[in-house]
Amino acid sequence: MKKQAHVISHSHWDREWYLPYEKHHCLEVEFMDRLLDTMERDPDFKSFHLDGQTIMLDDYLQVRPEKKELVEKLVKEKRLYIGPWYILQDEWLTGSESNLRNLETGMREAARYGNVSKVGYFPDSFGNMGQAPQILLDAGIDCAAFGRGVKPTGFNNEVAENDNFTSQYSEMFWESPDGSRILGVLFANWYNNGMEVPAEPEEARKYWEEKLAGAMKFASTDHLLFMNGCDHQPVQTDLSQALMTASELFPDITFIHSNFMDYCRCLKEEHKEDLAVIKGELRSQETDGWYTLANTASARIYLKQMNARCEALFVRAAEPPWLMNGERNTLMICWPTAGKR
């Protein structure tokens, strides 16, 4: 079988990070305008993964409500993949119920737009909660992708070469304490290993020789993952031409503008039976210089205290009596509102 290069277009989108929310919001509108234009103009631009969130569409349509019909069309056609989360979260800085409601809200909102991407997506979480496989399986999701927490993580987030791999491959089984098990995919070459693919032949040859070798080093099957994007990365508008160039240069490789659903399906059909089993929390601190969780738990304690108080009020004070005789929509807005904060 020929090796298949699955190129998945995406952009990792923090609503707030090095800029305040509204500045990122303006950038997101520009980003989405360009993405939708590309998808309308180029039928060979097969799909785009919207970072495992649905809130990006809410933010975009707040400014561009006239684009709602087009957005829903692309979601239903499985060209624009959204969810299953409402918003990407740091799993350790919120209560456990928040993680459940984030997934519940995201799947409900994605279904409202027309389709749910059933891949547990944790691209840049600073470690992952041990019960994630159990929670995902309960939601009908049996595959997850993540970038951190499996040891050892090398410099620039690449897996280090030594004999102490927790997982020999970028694919593994991830198991919760209750025994729930899903297929896990580690971004061993990070989630930007397929960004800015050159369309010019000479540059493309050098690019793909390096990228293919990097992916083959860790892949357990002939299906190689290339993430075409990075943090707040604009869509690559000439990707279709770039993949045509790659196909001409490397006839022994099948280049596919893919999506996580197809990629995970291929993995499940062909993965090795002796994959490593990673159990519980993914919180490895073993690195060659970068600590995956440093300085995240103790920053801005007052905000964490306020968030914890809100969650406690929802779960222990407001919802129990509401469940007895409350109007359904009264508290439905609470968790999405808290998630935005």
Regions found by a protein language model. Give the residues of each.
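Catalytic-domain carbohydrate-binding cleft regions of carbohydrate-active enzymes
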Residues: 1-341
